[in-house]
């Protein structure tokens, strides 16, 4: 720790911060529709992602109805079931979670948390949302074309993805790949904005080691996405060329419908490498912003400094780097060179080390804290419990010997949903409860919020713990109907019915949450400027919700790190980052 006198701290510039003239909206259209304000763009991203996410939620209910009560619902057939799987998975992983964490929280929080007036490139930021919206519309249009959306599975493996026997082989796969290409273009415009804003638009005194961990998580995830998404982009373009022009990048010589196909010489394994080189970093593109947000929620609602701030930062960076050398643990049964499995199993276990550091630091932050069991805190605790449980099952799947018999069973589905479904959604919900007062100026209803949490949290475990057991029994995933297979015990059918009932109940809780959002917007209690008594800059704006340009006439000056809670001798139990020190005081640049 290096001590620097306060009168010098304000003169430490992390970057030049010119007070540029902002674009000022001149009409309702330029203020709320074609807005260049990052806060409005964040809300647009969030609403669009939530809308398409509701579609994915409905698809999951339809799949559960079929699995729980097979043959009861005649409007669901085998082809549609495969299409539902594909669309549900792709929407949740990319169009919902990536868009919410980076496009939603990233746009709203980065400028406020670093003390900037807006993103560095507001016009490009606006374009990024509209390209994302176009990608969502192209994806959704697949429901309305002949043949419907593709049923190739959300990983889109060739040759199945473009063979004539696959549902949605005509327009469905073309629209899916086109939508992915558009999404990546839109994200690249937004992602460059996030990175440049963090590096170049921080206010005076905001050194990198004073950034809130939310910003560190979003920043690192964005850098990862800018490196990982090109692999998916290239794979999507090449697969689209295979489908439309008859090239054979990924299509081997094979017999299709009794005749030798027009393809030959391609490698399906190459596509799997490209997809998972994107796919596993994508897990942490979603997880790292969640890690950062949870750190801020825990510190704020436990009224305690985050434990091991620098270690937490370096753990985020280490996870981001290691995530690029573990992708092939998704391919143990793909036919790749067997000895590669030992390398990727080793790197998979190594990445657990920085992840464990974060978990221990969260626990130590809670230790002897003044814990307030607010709704955001409940969701943060729910995330930690869920992520640890999901991570422990990941240790099984990271081991080659164990993964082979569990591959393509419901165990994989349960693990993936705990880590990439329930855990990040817990963070999204906790973050909404936490920052909703900043966005709207009103508090969400606490009773409805706690009802929402407990039904969601307990329901998730009642869904996915039995699903792990089904996987251990050997119940396969992606089956439209299990039938009377000898290796499936009768208890599996009863468990599937139980899981379906619980899933529908959890879905009802999300409707209560939506009601809470809308009702509180008009009838919620006024929040004031800083209802959680938080230290970070977004809570120190002169207006709530923040006005155009965020900071009025003068940008804030940062004097301390982001987690000054329960400071001995202080007038209150928190000290905001922009609060000037007493005359002659000395403060460290970073903990």
UniProtKB/Swiss-Prot annotation:
Q: Sorted alphabetically, which Gene3D superfamilies does this protein's record hold?
A: Cytochrome c oxidase-like, subunit I domain
What is the protein's membrane topology class? Multi-pass membrane protein
Q: Name one Pfam family in it.
A: COX1
Keyword annotations of the record: Cell membrane, Copper, Electron transport, Heme, Iron, Membrane, Metal-binding, Respiratory chain, Translocase, Transmembrane, Transmembrane helix, Transport
Kindly give the InterPro entries that the UniProt entry links to this protein: Cyt_c_oxase-like_su1_dom (IPR023616), Cyt_c_oxase-like_su1_sf (IPR036927), Cyt_C_Oxase_1 (IPR000883), Cyt_c_Oxase_su1_BS (IPR023615)
Name the residues that bind Cu cation: 280, 284, 329-330
Q: Which GO terms describe its cellular component?
A: plasma membrane
Under Enzyme Commission nomenclature, its number is: 7.1.1.9
Q: Which reaction is recorded as catalysed by this protein?
A: 4 Fe(II)-[cytochrome c] + O2 + 8 H(+)(in) = 4 Fe(III)-[cytochrome c] + 2 H2O + 4 H(+)(out)
Q: What EC class is this?
A: translocase
Molecular function as annotated in GO = cytochrome-c oxidase activity; heme binding; metal ion binding
1'-histidyl-3'-tyrosine (His-Tyr) crosslink site(s): 280-284
Compartments annotated for it: namely: Cell membrane
Instruction: Please give the start and end residues of each transmembrane region.
Output: 40-60, 90-110, 126-146, 172-192, 215-235, 274-294, 313-333, 337-357, 377-397, 412-432, 453-473, 498-518
Similarity remark = Belongs to the heme-copper respiratory oxidase family.
UniProt subunit comment:
This alternate cytochrome c oxidase consists of a subunit I and two cytochromes c. Equivalents to subunit 2 and 3 are not present in this complex.
Name the job this protein performs: Cytochrome c oxidase is the component of the respiratory chain that catalyzes the reduction of oxygen to water. Subunits 1-3 form the functional core of the enzyme complex. Co I is the catalytic subunit of the enzyme. Electrons originating in cytochrome c are transferred via the copper A center of subunit 2 and a low-spin heme of subunit 1 to the bimetallic center formed by a high-spin heme and copper B.
Instruction: From the Swiss-Prot or TrEMBL record, give the protein name.
Output: Alternative cytochrome c oxidase subunit 1
State the taxonomy lineage.
Bacteria, Pseudomonadati, Pseudomonadota, Alphaproteobacteria, Hyphomicrobiales
């Amino acid at each position: 720790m290096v001590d620097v006198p306060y009168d010098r701290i304000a003169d430490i510039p992390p970057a030049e911060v010119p007070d540029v003239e902002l674009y000022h909206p001149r009409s309702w259209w330029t203020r709320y529709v074609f807005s260049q304000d990052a806060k409005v763009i964040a809300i647009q991203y969030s609403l669009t992602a939530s809308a398409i996410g509701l579609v994915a939620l409905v698809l999951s209910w339809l799949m559960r109805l079929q699995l729980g009560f097979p043959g009861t619902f005649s409007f669901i057939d085998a082809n549609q079931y495969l299409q539902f799987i594909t669309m549900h998975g792709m929407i949740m992983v990319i169009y919902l979670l990536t868009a919410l964490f980076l496009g939603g929280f990233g746009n709203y929080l980065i400028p406020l948390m670093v003390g900037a007036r807006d993103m560095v490139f507001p016009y490009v930021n606006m374009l990024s949302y509209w390209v994302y919206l176009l990608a969502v519309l192209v994806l959704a249009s697949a429901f309305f074309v002949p043949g419907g959306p593709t049923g190739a599975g959300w990983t889109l493996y060739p040759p199945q993805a473009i063979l004539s026997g696959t549902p949605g082989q005509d327009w469905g796969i073309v629209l899916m790949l086109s939508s992915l290409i558009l999404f990546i273009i839109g994200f690249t415009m937004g992602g460059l904005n996030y990175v440049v804003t963090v590096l170049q638009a921080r206010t005076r005194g905001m050194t990198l080691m004073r950034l809130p961990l939310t910003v560190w998580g979003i920043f690192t995830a964005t850098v990862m996405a800018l490196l990982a998404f090109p692999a998916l982009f290239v794979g999507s373009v090449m697969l689209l060329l295979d489908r439309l022009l008859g090239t054979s990048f990924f299509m081997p010589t094979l017999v299709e419908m009794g005749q030798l196909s027009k393809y030959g010489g391609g490698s399906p394994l190459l596509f799997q490498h490209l997809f998972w080189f994107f796919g596993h970093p994508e897990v942490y593109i979603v997880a790292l912003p969640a890690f950062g947000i949870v750190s801020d929620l825990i510190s704020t609602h436990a009224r305690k400094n985050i434990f091991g701030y620098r270690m937490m930062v370096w753990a985020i960076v280490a996870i981001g780097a290691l995530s690029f050398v573990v992708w092939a643990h998704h391919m143990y049964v793909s036919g790749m060179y067997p000895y590669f499995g030992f390398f990727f199993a080793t790197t998979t276990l190594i990445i657990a080390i920085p992840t464990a550091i974060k978990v221990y630091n969260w626990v130590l932050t809670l230790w002897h804290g003044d814990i307030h069991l607010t709704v955001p805190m409940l969701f943060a605790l729910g995330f930690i419990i869920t992520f640890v449980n999901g991570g422990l099952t990941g240790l099984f799947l990271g081991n080659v010997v164990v993964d082979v018999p569990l591959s393509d069973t419901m165990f994989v589905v349960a693990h993936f949903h705990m880590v990439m479904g329930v855990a990040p959604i817990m963070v999204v919900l906790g973050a909404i409860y936490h920052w909703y007062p900043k966005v709207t100026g009103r508090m969400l209803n606490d009773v409805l919020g706690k009802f929402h949490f407990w039904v969601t949290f307990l329901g998730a475990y009642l869904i996915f713990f039995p699903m792990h057991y089904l996987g251990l029994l050997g119940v396969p995933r992606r089956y439209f109907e299990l039938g009377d297979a000898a290796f499936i015990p009768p208890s599996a059918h009863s468990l599937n019915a139980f899981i379906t009932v619980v899933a529908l109940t959890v879905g009802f809780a999300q409707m209560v949450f939506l009601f809470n959002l809308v009702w509180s917007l008009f009838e919620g209690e006024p929040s004031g400027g800083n209802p959680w008594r938080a230290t970070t800059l977004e809570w120190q704006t002169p207006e709530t919700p923040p006005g155009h340009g965020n900071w009025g006439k003068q940008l804030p000056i940062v004097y301390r790190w982001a987690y000054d809670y329960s400071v001995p001798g202080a007038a209150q139990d928190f000290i905001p980052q922009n609060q000037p020190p007493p005359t002659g005081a000395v403060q460290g640049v970073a903990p």
